[in-house]
Amino acid sequence: FDEKGTAFLHSCLHTTSEWITIDEIGFLESNSCKYRQAIRTLMKHKQLLMVVRKQKLPFLEELRNHKDVFLVDLDQPYGNAGCIIMASGQGTRFGGNKLLADFNGQPLIDFSLNIIKNLFTTCVVVTIHREIQSLCIKQNIPVLLHTFPHRNDMIRLGLETIGDYIDRCVFLPADQPLLQKESMISLLLCAENDRNSIWRTCYGDIVGSPVIFPAEFFEELQNLPLRKGGSLVINNHPDRIRTFSVSDINELRDIDTPDDLSQLLHRNL
């Protein structure tokens, strides 16, 4: 490492590529003073993609805790996150249960159910619709059927169900069929790297859902005023908000009316 490894790292400074990949850094590499310094120098001039072992060694801790590092734990990349799928809309403007409406051959809610698979420690679909309950049971997805009328009830019930088991919670509407799984994954990775912030999706200046709240906000969310939603908590803590930009504005569009459905179907073609 003192000779060939260090020389290679120095040569990377003069490549035209902005990105350098190093696989991997562990006990042997961290014992070389010259190698450690070469890594530090390279970090100042290039974008590095590094695989770093979890050993509790000073240099490895330094790399993992560096202020400019975006850290992904390959054993648990999304952290201890839960998800509440909001599926209790009355569908008044739609003229019926919009979540069962056909969208490219699938019930509308299926797109949200597919997104959450293999991402969360635990999840629950909160709904007033028995048809949605049956659909979730068939897919082995936890579901809570209730009869409460308001958004604050839905949030409270969801957190009462899973809040004790998670460090943060995603609130995912069930009517955004063009939201991409890659966007959800990116949002989760951001929240795992900055665990103290409320994370939400955006497109330019337009903010939207899903939203991730750290556990410290659960009590406030469970005690929302009648008919109020998570936006009240967001507005109470503007200094704690961070956003992740999606690649397409249509990812943030929800469906409230048959015309909304038609427009998104046309866009999806």
Regions found by a protein language model. Give the residues of each.
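Short, high-confidence coil segments that cap the C-terminus of an alpha-helix
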Residues: 17, 45, 120, 166-167, ...
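ATP-dependent small-molecule kinase phosphotransfer cores
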Residues: 1-16
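Conserved alpha/beta core of the MobA/IspD/sugar-nucleotide pyrophosphorylase nucleotidyltransferase superfamily
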Residues: 219, 223-269
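Conserved N-terminal catalytic core of the sugar/cofactor nucleotidyltransferase
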Residues: 110-168, 182
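Short, glycine-/small-residue-rich phosphate/pyrophosphate-handling segment
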Residues: 58-70, 207, 211-237
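Conserved beta-loop-beta/alpha segment of the NTase-like Rossmann-fold superfamily
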Residues: 151-219
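N-terminal glycine-rich phosphate-binding loop and ensuing alpha1 helix
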Residues: 81-130
